[in-house]
A protein has these predicted regions:
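Binding-site signature for planar aromatic cofactors or substrates
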Residues: 1-206
């Protein structure tokens, strides 16, 4: 059995199939050039335009859940390059997402920009922050809700990894979809500037 290819990230399942299907070199290039452990300036600009976020969470037994959040552009805010936050509005009282995050903080966020045909993945560890505490830490943010009513609480996420979701399979009304292409431009290139961002997984020295 192949040994893990340190120091790159990747789950055991990812590594198993990369070895099985012969994509290890391609995967390592992606990890090295497109995956970073922070938000790049272009990612921060991208988040400021987004009105929808998909959030995946998991309960302590491993059962997954996927939900969605909406708001005015920029409702998900980058507090710094390692941290983002979003408001939690009044819902149905079930607290599936927050319940999972309270017990298993790991979360995976996905943002899809259909206008620019590009996506962003952000993984990290989430913390539920009550409104009073958020107001004390970030008064300019908590005092200016971007929805129609004040949030009941906030979620703050410490970023572990972030990376592009390329545009090659995004639907487009005015042309063909580039199914399966390896063309760099068709996939969106280095849209988020990750290639020139210091990465703990880039061992090339450049």
């Amino acid at each position: 059995m192949a040994q893990p290819r340190s120091p790159f990230p990747g789950t055991p399942g990812e590594r198993y199939l990369q070895d099985l299907y012969g994509t290890s070199e391609r995967a390592d290039t992606f990890y090295r050039q497109q995956m970073v452990d922070r938000l790049t300036p272009r990612m921060v600009e991208f988040l400021a335009r987004q009105t929808m976020m998909v959030v995946a969470s998991v309960d302590p037994e491993g059962a997954p859940d996927v939900s969605v959040r909406f708001g005015e552009a920029g409702f998900v805010t980058a507090l710094d390059e390692q941290t983002l936050a979003w408001p939690e509005m009044r819902g149905n009282g079930v607290f599936t997402t927050l319940g999972n995050l309270a017990k298993t903080p790991s979360a995976h966020l996905m943002f899809l920009d259909y206008e620019h045909r590009i996506g962003l993945h952000v993984r990290g560890d989430a913390e539920i922050v009550e409104t009073d505490a958020m107001r004390a830490a970030h008064p300019e943010l908590a005092a200016a809700p971007r929805t129609g009513r004040a949030p009941e609480r906030w979620v703050v996420l410490r970023v572990r990894t972030s990376y592009i979701h390329c545009r090659k399979h995004f639907p487009t009304p005015d042309g063909p979809v580039d199914w399966g292409t390896d063309d760099v431009a068709a996939k969106g290139g280095d849209y988020f500037g990750a290639k020139n961002t210091p990465s703990p997984w880039d061992t090339t020295g450049g």
